[in-house]
UniProtKB/Swiss-Prot annotation:
Keyword Transmembrane appears in the UniProt entry: no
Modification 3-oxoalanine (Cys) occurs at: C97
High-level lineage: Bacteria, Pseudomonadati, Bacteroidota, Flavobacteriia, Flavobacteriales
Entry EC no(s): 3.1.6.-
Signal sequence coordinates: 1-27
Post-translational note: The conversion to 3-oxoalanine (also known as C-formylglycine, FGly), of a serine or cysteine residue in prokaryotes and of a cysteine residue in eukaryotes, is critical for catalytic activity.
SUPFAM superfamilies attached to this UniProt entry: Alkaline phosphatase-like
Chief location bin: periplasm
Protein name, UniProt field: Ulvan-active sulfatase
Primary role: Sulfatase involved in ulvan degradation. Ulvan is the main polysaccharide component of the Ulvales (green seaweed) cell wall. It is composed of disaccharide building blocks comprising 3-sulfated rhamnose (Rha3S) linked to D-glucuronic acid (GlcA), L-iduronic acid (IduA), or D-xylose (Xyl). The sulfatase desulfates Xyl2S-Rha3S, product of the degradation of ulvan by endo-acting alpha-1,4-L-rhamnosidase, to Xyl-Rha3S.
GO cellular component: periplasmic space
Length: 596
């Protein structure tokens, strides 16, 4: 679907949306400036303490109509874009989910807190290492905990994957049933819904949507029994015949030049877009709930992906195909509707921005900057990214990008780009690439990923070379830009304390302060004075959560954050857990009023 906009002499805007209900025969993924009404105004007047809704999808490149790709119709996202602002220059800090989600949760770069390897709790045993968690500084809290402290009801539905176990204080609810509808009526909310439809595993064969992807967000429906809650992504698939089809299998796809145009690849492209169609359907279900509740114009709605696309040579890499993900924000009363904000935005900017939106000053430890709200910063000049271990395979790459150029530093130039990652090799396109490589049938652009070695430095003009295939690092005409971005990368590495060459074993030793075992949060201590309960914990930076079970056996529906002394009803029982991020949580302590 293409958006056409015209401005008339009476300054009224006519929005004409051309919906393609007939399957297009030559759909094309555009890599050009989006034709829209104009750029967003410098300042936005936002309501005080608005509700905030995040709609987060996985493995999402710019494969949707608001960003120039009309292959599959997405009526709900297209409407959201029509009523909101599109952000074409959002970049994840990594080309894979867990490190990127760590950045979102903390406002810190993954490589500054030990969250840069994919994942900290898997594929370590095979390398003779223990499973571990990222350990940020002691003053770091999850973004949602800061919002809870500010009075927000915070829900997550339901993926976490932060590279550390979330403290009980992080969310009011985190489950497939988590929903803003469970809050007190007078309470603002921050609600996160994670859509898994577009994950790379959705390209595996046999194809079919999984139960986790067909729920249409049954949040709040506690009578529904989940078959797949907590189980493998791949379980409980419907057959392909049962799976809804959002576009014809005969659709002609604009396949990126780094992939071959074979029937298997075309089928994966069809699955990719079909999954987007289902994701859009689920987004629409959540938005309908918001509208049904009369909350649409009191809520700032974010839609974005957790990194770039799912295909080989996209996910896990720090080319734009792996980092760039579309974002749409709809503001109450359609403020700045149908505009684009071209500023560079990094995932580390989300945490300070949300605090800024609700009038809270961003925390000093946060390495990002606010791009909206009371504490909005001037636009950033660069975004930064890193790639390290993925499952059982390791590389070390760092990158910096401005609005046009990207600089990549390869710390292992003797090693090729391609890594034989078992999970990725379940994708038919990956199997096809390997088959054609073995047969000598890949062209020069497709073979670049399979080079035996790679240059120490790469420089790409992302405007003229959006697929990053032409390295300009040795071109004399671009030496000034090369030096500029090289210096910026060095500055960034020093600023965040990223020792790119640090072996993972030494990283773990550093996170654990020289110990061979993961640190444990001290058990909380409780005292009472004049009827007031006081809780403390000897572990610096530990969050303390508590629940009260009354004499009538009624339990708090959520874990409260301990902020200071409080009174406890007679005959009740107190359950307490202390937890510093990256440490193991304390034991759960239970104390009744009769014990005090």
């Amino acid at each position: 679907m293409l958006f056409l906009r015209f401005k008339f002499f009476n300054n009224r805007l006519l929005f004409v949306s051309v919906l393609c209900f007939v399957i297009c025969v030559s759909c094309k993924r555009e890599h050009k400036e989006i034709k829209i009404k104009g750029e967003k105004a410098t300042e936005l007047k936002l309501p005080e303490r608005p509700n905030i809704l995040w709609l987060v999808t996985e493995d999402m490149g710019a494969y949707i109509p608001p960003f120039g790709d009309s292959t599959v119709v997405t009526p709900h996202l297209s409407k959201l874009a029509k009523e909101g602002v599109i952000y074409p220059n959002l970049y994840s800090t990594s080309g894979v989910c867990a490190p990127s989600r760590a950045a979102i949760a903390t406002g810190m770069y993954p490589s500054s807190i030990g969250a840069n390897h994919m994942r900290t709790n898997s594929f370590t045993k095979e390398r003779g290492l223990p499973a571990y968690e990222a350990v940020p500084p002691s003053n770091v809290r999850m973004l949602s905990e800061w919002l809870r402290k500010a009075g927000y009801y915070c829900t997550n539905n339901y993926k976490t994957d932060y590279q550390f176990k979330a403290p009980v204080t992080a969310w009011d609810e985190s489950s497939p049933y988590a929903h803003w509808r469970n809050r007190n009526d007078d309470q603002p909310f921050f609600a996160v819904f994670n859509f898994t439809d577009t994950h790379e595993s959705g390209l595996f064969e046999p194809y079919g949507l999984r139960e986790i992807e067909t729920r249409l967000y049954r949040a709040g429906d506690t009578t529904y029994q989940w078959k797949n809650y907590g189980a493998s992504h791949a379980n409980n698939r419907m057959s392909e015949a049962e799976t809804p089809q959002y576009l014809s299998k005969d659709t002609k796809f604009n396949i990126p030049p780094y992939l071959p145009e074979t029937d298997l690849v075309k089928r994966d492209m069809w699955k990719l877009y079909n999954n987007i169609g289902e994701m859009d359907n689920q987004v629409g279900a959540v938005l309908q709930q918001l509208e049904d509740d009369g909350l649409l114009e009191n809520t700032i709605i974010f839609f974005y992906g957790d990194h770039g696309g799912p295909l080989p040579r996209e996910k896990r890499l720090i080319y734009d195909s792996g980092l760039n993900t579309p974002m749409i924000i709809r503001f109450p009363n359609k403020l700045e509707a149908e505009t684009s904000d071209p500023q560079l935005i990094s995932f580390v900017d989300f945490a300070p921005t949300l605090l800024s939106i609700i009038g809270e000053k961003p925390k000093e430890y946060m390495q990002g900057q606010a791009f909206l709200g009371q504490y909005k910063n001037k636009e950033r000049s660069y975004i930064h990214a890193a790639a390290d271990r993925f499952d059982a395979e390791t590389d070390v790459i760092r990158a910096v990008r401005d609005k046009r150029f990207k600089y990549i530093r390869n710390y292992r130039p003797e090693q090729g780009y391609y890594l034989p990652i078992d999970y990725r090799e379940r994708i038919p396109t990956m199997q096809e690439l390997l088959r054609l490589k073995a047969e000598g049938k890949l062209n020069e652009e497709q073979m670049q990923w399979f080079r035996d070695v790679k240059p120490e430095e790469e420089l790409f003009d992302c405007k003229s070379d959006p697929f990053e295939l032409k390295n300009l690092a040795n071109n004399p005409e671009y030496q000034n830009k090369l030096v500029e971005l090289r210096k910026e990368l060095d500055r960034w590495l020093t600023a965040i304390g990223d020792d790119a060459n640090l072996p993972e074993s030494e990283l773990i030793n550093k996170l654990w302060n020289g110990s061979n075992t993961q640190p444990v949060t001290s058990d909380p201590k409780v005292s009472i004075n004049n009827g007031n309960i006081t809780i403390s914990c000897d572990t610096e930076g530990a969050s303390v959560g508590y629940k009260i079970v009354t004499a009538g056996n009624k339990t708090s529906k959520t874990w409260h954050i301990y902020n200071g002394p409080f009174k406890m009803p007679l005959g009740s029982t107190l359950e307490i857990i202390a937890h510093r991020i990256g440490f193991k949580p304390s034991k759960a302590i239970q104390i009744s009023t009769s014990d005090l």
